[in-house]
């Protein structure tokens, strides 16, 4: 009996470590992806290096800060552990340097056109990766921090973690938030949220998280490929 209990404890600890490691990966992916997204919009708006840094950082940590305020984890994680802030700052500077180097050679119309296509593709990729990673991370953080199984709370915090940074980014850049336009954006989050919430009751949490992450990616790319949009 004691051996069985001992094995169960170790199994639970192993699962917790796996989930924690996966969430750390999601956190890094989301931080880099959203920092790229924010930095690129700042470049498009012809901001200076400081503006690029601000938009990169805000896009990266903004959703997580809102999440922490909602669930009562204060001060927000971005102040308790500045890892994401540092990652997003470095990413923003790297994006700025790459853009400056590339911009010196983008003189012909053909290269300028190619640059514009590359900009939109990279923006879509980074935004989608950040959206998927932070949506699942927001849900998992809520479940663990509040020890709750309330779907509406978990779903709301997951959604706001995913889209919050992008909303702040767009407002600072003087644009209508992307999530409020016709694009399949928050809708993709909802599919991932529902998938993760259902599956984590039946399969290992890290597997449920990966499937939820992939669902967000899949819906976003299918929407882009088939030009799905919400009516307006």
Go through the PLM ranges and name each one.
Residues 2-7, 11-22, 71-79, 139-153, ...:
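Helix-coil boundary and interhelical linker segments in multi-pass alpha-helical membrane proteins
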Residues 80-86, 150, 181-188, 203-213:
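Loop-to-transmembrane alpha-helix initiation sites
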Residues 18-26, 52-55, 118-126, 176-185:
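Short, amphipathic, aromatic/basic-enriched membrane-interface segments that mark the entry/exit
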Residues 21-60, 68-71:
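The feature marks the first
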Residues 41, 49, 70-71, 75-76, ...:
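Double-stranded RNA-binding/processing signature
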Residues 68-73, 97-111, 143-146:
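Transmembrane alpha-helix boundary signature
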Residues 31-39, 60-61, 65-69, 88-101, ...:
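Transmembrane alpha-helical segments of multi-pass membrane transport proteins and ion-pumping complexes
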Residues 19-31, 77-90, 149-162:
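Structural signature of hydrophobic alpha-helical transmembrane segments
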């Amino acid at each position: 009996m004691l051996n069985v209990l001992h094995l169960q404890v170790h199994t639970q600890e192993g699962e917790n470590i796996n989930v924690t490691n996966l969430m750390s990966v999601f956190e890094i992916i989301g931080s880099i992806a959203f920092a790229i997204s924010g930095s690129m919009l700042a470049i498009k708006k012809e901001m200076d290096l400081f503006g690029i840094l601000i938009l990169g950082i805000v896009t990266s940590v903004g959703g997580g800060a809102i999440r922490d305020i909602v669930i009562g984890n204060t001060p927000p994680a971005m102040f308790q552990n500045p890892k994401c802030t540092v990652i997003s700052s470095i990413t923003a500077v790297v994006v700025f340097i790459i853009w400056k180097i590339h911009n010196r050679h983008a003189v012909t119309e053909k290269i300028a056109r190619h640059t514009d296509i590359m900009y939109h593709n990279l923006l879509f990729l980074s935004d989608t990766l950040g959206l998927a990673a932070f949506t699942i991370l927001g849900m998992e953080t809520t479940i663990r921090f509040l020890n709750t199984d309330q779907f509406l709370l978990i779903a709301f915090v997951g959604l706001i973690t995913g889209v919050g940074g992008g909303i702040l980014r767009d407002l600072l850049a003087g644009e209508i938030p992307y999530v409020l336009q016709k694009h399949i954006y928050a809708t993709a989050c909802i599919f991932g949220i529902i998938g993760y919430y259902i599956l984590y009751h039946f399969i290992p949490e890290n597997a449920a998280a990966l499937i939820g992450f992939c669902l967000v990616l899949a819906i976003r790319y299918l929407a882009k490929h088939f030009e799905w949009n919400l009516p307006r």
